[in-house]
Amino acid sequence: MITFKPITIEDKAEIESFTLPYAPANCDLAFANMFCWQFQFKTAWSVVDGFLVIRFQIGGSDRIGYMQPVGAGDFTPVLRHLEEDILAAGQRLRIIDMTPEGLEKLRSVGHCQFAFASDRNLEDYVYNASDLRDLPGRKYQSKRNHINRFEAEYEYRYEPMTRDHAAECMRLEAEWRKTRSGHTGELSAEQRAMQRAFAHFDRLGLIGGCIYVGDKLVAFTYGSPINDHTFCVHVEKADTEYDGAFTIINREFVAHLPEQYTLIDREEDLGIPGLRQAKLSYHPAFLEKKYTALCLYPDEIACKRLWIKCFGDEETFIDSFLIGHYSRKRMLAAEEDGRLAAMLHLIPFESELGRA
């Protein structure tokens, strides 16, 4: 078994000795994200054969996942250690946030037959810093119009964020949340993560910015590096009564970042239509694909083979089903001579009439 330990603030330097030189543009590999959300995912880490290995619990369940090992060179020798570790936990190997290059390496290893799938909802939006700073050309005309109206209507100032801004920022976040999902009085997971961020602001190396109109905070944002040239925006909030506040904080913040950060990762859209539209409106340079690799059980392999034989669907489609929807409890199967001959999958869904 691998000896993992929970991520703590004291681990920042060692973890970043792997992520800053080698990590892809993936928001999940920003140390501040791993630390601030540790309470949610029980994130733990270890160094195995010269690679950083991150382990976590998926969706609040007991299911274990590993991130693609981070380091220089070929990570595939680390796989046998992951297999031993997950076997000791009585589960099967699941690796998430794999790059396309990592996926190809995994395909070439005969340890296990994997299913691979990506989720558009979890792809990171990565922008050229110069585009967000300068808003050049016709495609950014609407953004420049927003800024021009804001600057014409309000006397504003930009302030670099410090821990002293925490109380004001949390109040604005609470007001913003009321307009989005209704106020329950309960502390959301994001609010807990923000509290951790502000409590350790300096030690995390966070960089943030605030927009004031007079003495009123109307927008704020903060983030941290993923690697030595990619900066990740973790949080961005604004008072929507001030038209253009989101646009102005976006531009001003990037304009005040160190020049070494040529790429800006604004994280994923989680499949939320409004968020997707907003992120696309800034014209990302690319979307960072993240693949999940799942070691298949024998019955799943048999299911996949029969599916291909009968229907000829692409493996990517079948793999996506196996990772996201397959369940032994909802599958009816018929065998002949010890081989799977027919199968029926029952998939629950929500309709206007209820759950079916």
Explain the meaning of each model-derived region.
Residues 36, 199-204, 322-328:
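Short loop/turn motifs at secondary-structure junctions and domain boundaries
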Residues 45, 49-58, 210, 215-225, ...:
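Conserved beta-strand in the GNAT
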Residues 169-228, 232:
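A mid-sequence, solvent-exposed acidic-amphipathic segment
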Residues 206-293, 356:
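Aromatic (often tryptophan-rich) hydrophobic motifs at membrane interfaces
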